[in-house]
């Protein structure tokens, strides 16, 4: 049965009221897939890119469990949520408080960059849900300041990024401390690769695997097209022109490498476009300042790599620009999911050089719809567009040449004469007489 409304999920009235306050009536694909098995107490292995409602997909069943089975007296946390970054932990906590605002449930946050005294209340007062980063939480566990024995559900958000950041051992240590738990939910942007699958096998027991990309209806809120660029200079000129348009009120520009982040940020500043940037090696204070500048409207352009932008939620993004084309359809969906949130519409623009056309075709096939081209009159490309039939497969001419080379190599090989009696089944295996190999002798 397909779930079309939140009321069909048999959620508590207080949660339905909170969803209504936020304007949410229909569950997204990942919510419809993940919430029912989670409510049944099953372990869940979920995959969904940013912008698909992944956070509510695990928060709603966790909150419902606490309401269905209230404890008689106060105690340590019953739900533990682990995130890779402080920003994501704060966002998840805020989201949980919004969903729990008509209940009496308590939510606390434990992250790095915060003095111990600020976490003292978490240890001394009743907490139902704790959202934490692994490093700081593990420190408190080792100091015996945090009690994991009451944790009933362990939730891992952005698990793939936690692995990328080298937190696998820390998470497994924490999972060991919560070994009395009844349920584990693991969510990731992608489930591709042996690392995430092996990790999930070690932590989850007979999980229900759910995967949901944005539906066609959700993607239609995002206008997608591309501009063809002759070279890097032309591509930068296109980006500058598009960022200066009045409709680009808040934009994220994605690049593939950290080095390009600094280059592009400087080029945009030279063109009169004030911007901020995020890259993997930034200290926490600078990351917070960059995000604050963007959300407060002091700048309206953020340049970022995929890894650096993971785990941050920036509201009201009007445009997403792929300055460097992503190498996978998953990454493309993850990027464009930054816009068109909360029922709004958004725009995703890709800037494509000749060598990017194969990636463009790959993305189009993945999302099962072609991305259409547009042209700016004063910045028309001067080079010819690659053939639309270009697929990345070798042409017939190339295949014919390869076949000829293969035949030539076979002709060069010396032919060994085979006699019929050498190939007959004659019982005990022996060397064919035509090999010219002398019999072995043993020395006494």
From Swiss-Prot:
Domain of life the protein comes from: Bacteria
Motif Q motif location, chain numbering: 4-32
All residue ranges annotated as the Helicase ATP-binding domain in the record: 35-209
Compartment(s): Cytoplasm
Bias kind Basic residues: ranges: 394-406, 414-432
GO molecular function: ATP binding; ATP hydrolysis activity; ATP-dependent activity, acting on RNA; poly(A) binding; RNA helicase activity; RNA strand annealing activity
Positions with a binding annotation for ATP: 48-55
Biased composition (Basic and acidic residues): 382-391
Role this protein plays: DEAD-box RNA helicase involved in the assembly of the 50S ribosomal subunit at low temperature. Exhibits RNA-stimulated ATP hydrolysis and RNA unwinding activity. Acts before DeaD.
Family statement drawn from the similarity comment of this UniProt entry: Belongs to the DEAD box helicase family. SrmB subfamily.
The protein, known as: ATP-dependent RNA helicase SrmB
Organism the protein comes from: Escherichia coli (strain K12)
């Amino acid at each position: 049965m397909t779930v079309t409304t939140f009321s069909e999920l048999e959620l508590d009235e207080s949660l339905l009221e909170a969803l209504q306050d936020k304007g949410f009536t229909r569950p997204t694909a990942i919510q419809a897939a993940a919430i029912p098995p989670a409510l049944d107490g099953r372990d869940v292995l979920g995959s969904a890119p940013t912008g698909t409602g992944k956070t509510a997909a695990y928060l709603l069943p966790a909150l419902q469990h606490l309401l269905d089975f209230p404890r008689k007296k106060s105690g340590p946390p019953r739900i533990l949520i682990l995130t890779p970054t402080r920003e994501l932990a704060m966002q998840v906590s805020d989201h949980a408080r919004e969903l729990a605002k008509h209940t009496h449930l308590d939510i606390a946050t434990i992250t790095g960059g915060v003095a111990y005294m600020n976490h003292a209340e978490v240890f001394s007062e009743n907490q139902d849900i704790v959202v934490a980063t692994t490093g700081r939480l593990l420190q408190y566990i080792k100091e015996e300041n945090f009690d994991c024995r009451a944790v009933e559900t362990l939730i891992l958000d952005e698990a793939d990024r936690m692995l990328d950041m080298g937190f696998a051992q820390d998470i497994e240590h924490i999972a060991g401390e919560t070994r009395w738990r009844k349920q584990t939910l693991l969510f990731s942007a992608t489930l591709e690769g042996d690392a995430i699958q092996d990790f999930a096998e070690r932590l989850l027991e007979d999980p229900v695997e759910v995967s949901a990309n944005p539906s066609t209806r959700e993607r239609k809120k995002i206008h997608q097209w591309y501009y063809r660029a002759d070279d890097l200079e032309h591509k930068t000129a296109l980006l500058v022109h598009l960022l200066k348009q009045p409709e680009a009120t808040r934009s994220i520009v994605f690049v593939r490498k950290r080095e390009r982040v600094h280059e592009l940020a400087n080029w945009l500043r030279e063109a009169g476009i004030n911007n901020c940037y995020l890259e993997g090696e930034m200290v926490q204070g600078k990351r917070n300042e960059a995000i604050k500048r963007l959300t407060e409207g002091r700048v309206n352009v953020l340049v970022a790599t995929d890894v650096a932008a993971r785990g941050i939620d920036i509201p009201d993004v009007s445009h997403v620009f792929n300055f460097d084309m992503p190498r996978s359809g998953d990454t493309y969906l993850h990027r464009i999911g930054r816009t068109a949130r909360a029922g709004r519409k958004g725009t995703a623009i890709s800037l494509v050089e000749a060598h990017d056309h194969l990636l463009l075709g790959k993305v189009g096939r993945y999302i099962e719809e072609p991305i259409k081209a547009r042209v700016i009159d004063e910045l028309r490309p001067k080079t010819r567009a690659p053939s639309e039939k270009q697929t990345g497969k070798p042409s017939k001419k190339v295949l014919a040449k390869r076949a000829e080379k293969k035949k030539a190599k076979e002709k060069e090989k010396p032919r060994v004469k085979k006699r019929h009696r050498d190939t007959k089944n004659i019982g005990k295996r022996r060397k064919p007489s035509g090999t010219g190999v002398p019999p072995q002798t043993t020395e006494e």
